C-alpha cells in the first residue's frame, strides 16, 4: 500500500472535490486561487507556494474575527499547500482608491489589526507584509490575510533568511540588517495608518496631531524606539 502524505492528500482533495473559480495571485513562488466545494458550494482560498507553512499550521486551531480561519495546511519538500476561509469583502487598498478614512475609522481598523497581530505575535509569528492589499473589510471587521511571507521568530537567528515584504511598508531590518520580530509589523502598521489618513507614505506627508505622533513612533528606524508590541500600540489608539 502506498503511503499518502497529508500534503498529497490535500492536493488530491482540492483537485477532485473543488472547482477552481479564478486565480487571485500568481508569482514565481506560487499561486492563490478561489475554489468552490462541489457538494456544499462553499468558497475557500487555496494557496500553494514555495516556502515554510509553519505559520499556517500554527493558525489551524485559531478562531479570530480579524484573521481568516485556516482549514488545512500541509508542507512537503519545501512546498506548502493551504486551504483557508474565503473572506468576502473589498480590500483596504480598493477602498482607498475612492476615499480616505476618517480618524475614527482609521483608529478602528488599526485596533482590529493590532488584535490580529497580537494573536500572531503570541504564537511567535511575524507577518512581515502588513499593507492595505492584505486587509479585507468584512462588514465592520478588518481581516488581515496572506501569511506567505510570515515567519517564526527564532532566538538563534541573526537576520531573516529571506528578504520578503513590500517596499515602502517593510521595516529596515527586513532587508537583512538583523532578524525581524513583532516590531517590524508595528512599523508596517504605522505606514498603513498614515496612508489611510493622508493617502501618502509618512516620508512624504505625516498625519496631523496625535495620530501623526503615533505614526512617527511606529516608524522609527530603530526597533527599540517603536511601540514594542501590538498591545502597547492598541493602548494609545
Please identify what each model-predicted range represents:
Residues 63-72:
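Conserved HxN/HPN-centered segment at the entrance to the catalytic loop
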Residues 226:
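Conserved HRD-motif arginine in the catalytic loop of eukaryotic-like protein kinases
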Residues 19-58:
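ATP-binding glycine-rich loop module of kinase domains
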Residues 121-137:
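Catalytic-loop of the protein kinase fold
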Residues 185:
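Conserved catalytic-loop aspartate of Hanks-type protein kinases
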Residues 109-110:
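Activation segment signature within eukaryotic-like protein kinase domains
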Residues 77-91, 95:
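Conserved short submotifs of the Hanks-type protein kinase catalytic core
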Residues 159-173:
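Conserved activation segment of eukaryotic-like protein kinases, specifically the C-terminal portion
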Amino acid at each position: 500500500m502506498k503511503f499518502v502524505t497529508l500534503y498529497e492528500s490535500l492536493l488530491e482533495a482540492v483537485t477532485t472535490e473543488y472547482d477552481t473559480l479564478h486565480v487571485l495571485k500568481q508569482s514565481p513562488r506560487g499561486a492563490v486561487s478561489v475554489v468552490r466545494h462541489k457538494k456544499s458550494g462553499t468558497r475557500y482560498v487555496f494557496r500553494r507556494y514555495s516556502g515554510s507553512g509553519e505559520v499556517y499550521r500554527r493558525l489551524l486551531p485559531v478562531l479570530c474575527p480579524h484573521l481568516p480561519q485556516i482549514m488545512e495546511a500541509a508542507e512537503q519538500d519545501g512546498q506548502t499547500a493551504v486551504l483557508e476561509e474565503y473572506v468576502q469583502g473589498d480590500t483596504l487598498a480598493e477602498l482607498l482608491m475612492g476615499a480616505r478614512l476618517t480618524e475614527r475609522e482609521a483608529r478602528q481598523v488599526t485596533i482590529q489589526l493590532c488584535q490580529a497581530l497580537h494573536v500572531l505575535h503570541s504564537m511567535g509569528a511575524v507577518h512581515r507584509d502588513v499593507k492595505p492589499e492584505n486587509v479585507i473589510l468584512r462588514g465592520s471587521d478588518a481581516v488581515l490575510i496572506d501569511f506567505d511571507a510570515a515567519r517564526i521568530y527564532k532566538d538563534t537567528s541573526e537576520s531573516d533568511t529571506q528578504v520578503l515584504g513590500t517596499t515602502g511598508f517593510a521595516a529596515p531590518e527586513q532587508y537583512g540588517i538583523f532578524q525581524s520580530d513583532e516590531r517590524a509589523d508595528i512599523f508596517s502598521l504605522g505606514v498603513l495608518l498614515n496612508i489611510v489618513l493622508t493617502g501618502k507614505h509618512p516620508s512624504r506627508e505625516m498625519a496631523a496631531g496625535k495620530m501623526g505622533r503615533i505614526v512617527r513612533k511606529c516608524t522609527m528606524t530603530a526597533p527599540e524606539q517603536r511601540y514594542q508590541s501590538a498591545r502597547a500600540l492598541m493602548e494609545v489608539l
